[in-house]
Regions:
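Mid-chain, structured segments of secreted extracytoplasmic proteins
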Residues: 67-110
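A mature extracytoplasmic/lumenal domain signature
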Residues: 64-66, 87-89, 115, 125-127
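Bacterial N-terminal signal peptides that target proteins for export
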Residues: 1-11
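N-terminal signal peptide c-region/cleavage motif recognized by signal peptidases
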Residues: 21-24
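N-terminal secretory signal peptides
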Residues: 26-85
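C-terminal partner/receptor-binding element of secreted or periplasmic proteins
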Residues: 127-168
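Stable alpha-helical elements in mature extracytoplasmic
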Residues: 45, 49, 66, 91, ...
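Flexible, solvent-exposed short loops/turns enriched in glycine
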Residues: 103-104, 108-138
Length: 168
């Protein structure tokens, strides 16, 4: 096979793969994800989420998303926001148990807007996020404590989510 024929074949195969990828619907969240569909609007859920975080033992560390920046460029996309949530107490405790695990902090809530304006709240359970770090901890004690901290965070995130998604 000539170099030219190989190039054409590679191009066609690549294009075919791209066409298949475009036709496949987006994957649903994987293991560890929690997803709550709501009847709230995107802006309502964002407001309720921030309020629920402020009433918890955690704080909003960051609040970012492409929606507003896209609008400034004249592009209209559905609401999409990532809210990073954590606190210094958990940061210090987790850092003392696993330096590599801190790359995961803050843990994120994900607020998305559906096609009819309703919002969805999603997050990955902290225990799922930190499990690989507990599995590879230096000591059994560190592993146990990291799992315990992760479970505490699971409860806090669930409480925040419940409070944010209740109809007000």
């Amino acid at each position: 096979m000539t170099v030219h024929a190989r190039s054409i074949l590679s191009f066609v195969l690549g294009l075919s793969s791209l066409m298949v990828a475009v036709q496949v619907p987006a994957a649903t969240p994987s293991e560890g994800w929690k997803v709550i569909d709501t009847s709230q609007s995107y802006s309502e859920l964002l407001s309720h989420l921030k309020e629920a975080v402020s009433e918890s033992d955690l704080q909003v560390v960051f609040d970012v998303g492409p929606t507003e920046a896209a609008a400034k460029r004249g592009i209209d996309i559905p609401g999409n926001r990532v809210i990073g949530v954590f606190n210094n107490e958990f940061a210090v405790d987790i850092l003392s148990l696993s330096v590599p695990a801190m790359i995961e902090a803050p843990i994120r809530f994900y607020v998305t807007e559906g096609e009819h304006g309703q919002a969805t709240l999603s997050w990955i359970q902290p225990s799922h996020i930190y499990a690989p770090y507990a599995d590879s901890a230096d000591t059994a004690t560190s592993a146990k404590k990291l799992r315990e901290k992760s479970k505490e965070l699971d409860l806090l995130f669930s409480e925040i989510a419940i409070n944010a998604t209740q109809v007000k």
